Every structure is written in C-alpha cells, then in structure tokens.
C-alpha cells in the first residue's frame, strides 16, 4: 500500500475513534431529553440544535452522494433554519456570563432593550429533535 494512503487511513481511524468518544453519551442515554436533563437552557438549546444540524447535514450528504439535487428538497430549508438558530445561540453565548449564566448588563444595547436579546426557541428545538428521532 502506498505510504501516503496508509497515513491517510491512520488519520481517518484516529478521527473515527474521536467521533466514537464524542457520541458515546448519546449511545448510552435513553433519549436526548435524558442527555439534556440538568443542563442550562442555553446548553440544552446547543445540544438540540447541534443534533438537528447533524441529522440534516447527514441527510443532505446522503442526497449529494446519491446524485439527488438537494437544493430541491426540504432539507435545505431546514438547514438554513438551523443555521439561523446556531447564530442566535452564538449571539446569546456572547451575552451570557459563563459562570452565573446571568445576562451581561454591562452592554448598553442589551440593558437598554430586552427586545435586542436573542431568544432561543426551546419548543422549536424540542420539536426538531422529536421529529428526527
């Protein structure tokens, strides 16, 4: 076997081992809701939206690998919606103090108007996960 391919296979094998380690809690949990239990709302939202993104991007990859035009499928709309939630979660993380998870009121734009704060649609994230599990 070509040494270049051998090195690539070795790297792939290590990466797959890392994926298995990361996914082990999902495998051991009865449900995603059990996995989310005890986490903050922000952490739960991150978990739900990450799972939704993983499921939808896998479906997108399946379509592409089978020569199906994924742009005509609802998965594209779902991926865009999930990406919007990801950006909202990232924005929310910037506005939350990680130790207390209290909103950072030193930012004048946030303290002056609560309508500027991003809101994570917990119910929507839960529906997405229920739909895909």
UniProtKB/Swiss-Prot annotation:
Assigned keywords, A-Z: Cytoplasm, Exosome, Nucleus, RNA-binding, rRNA processing
Gene Ontology terms: biological process: exonucleolytic trimming to generate mature 3'-end of 5.8S rRNA from tricistronic rRNA transcript (SSU-rRNA, 5.8S rRNA, LSU-rRNA); maturation of 5.8S rRNA; nonfunctional rRNA decay; nuclear mRNA surveillance; nuclear polyadenylation-dependent mRNA catabolic process; nuclear polyadenylation-dependent rRNA catabolic process; poly(A)-dependent snoRNA 3'-end processing; regulation of gene expression
Family annotation (InterPro entries): Exosome-assoc_fac/DNA_repair, Sas10/Utp3/C1D
Localization per record: Cytoplasm; Nucleus
UniProt-annotated stretches for the region Disordered: 96-133
Coiled coil: none
One GO term describing the cellular component: nucleolus
Ranges annotated as biased composition (Low complexity): 102-116
Any one GO molecular-function label of the UniProt entry: DNA binding
Key word Secreted present: no
Pfam family, one: Sas10_Utp3
Major location category of this protein: cytoplasm
Similarity comment: Belongs to the C1D family.
Function: Required for exosome-dependent processing of pre-rRNA and small nucleolar RNA (snRNA) precursors. Involved in processing of 35S pre-rRNA at the A0, A1 and A2 sites.
PANTHER family: NUCLEAR NUCLEIC ACID-BINDING PROTEIN C1D, SUN-COR STEROID HORMONE RECEPTOR CO-REPRESSOR
Quaternary structure (record): Component of the exosome multienzyme ribonuclease complex. Interacts with cut3.
Protein name as catalogued: Exosome complex protein C1739.07
UniProt source species: Schizosaccharomyces pombe (strain 972 / ATCC 24843) (Fission yeast)
């Amino acid at each position: 076997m070509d040494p270049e391919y051998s090195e690539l296979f070795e790297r792939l094998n290590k990466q797959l081992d890392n994926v298995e380690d990361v996914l082990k809690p999902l495998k051991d949990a009865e449900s995603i809701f059990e996995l989310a239990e005890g986490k903050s709302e922000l952490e739960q939202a991150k978990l739900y939206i990450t799972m939704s993104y993983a499921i939808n991007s896998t479906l997108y990859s399946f379509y592409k690998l089978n020569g199906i035009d994924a742009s005509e499928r609802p998965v594209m709309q779902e991926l865009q919606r999930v990406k919007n939630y990801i950006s909202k979660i990232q924005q929310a993380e910037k506005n939350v103090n990680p130790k207390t998870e209290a909103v950072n009121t030193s930012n004048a734009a946030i303290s002056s108007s609560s309508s500027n704060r991003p809101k994570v649609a917990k119910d929507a994230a839960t529906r997405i996960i229920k739909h895909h599990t």
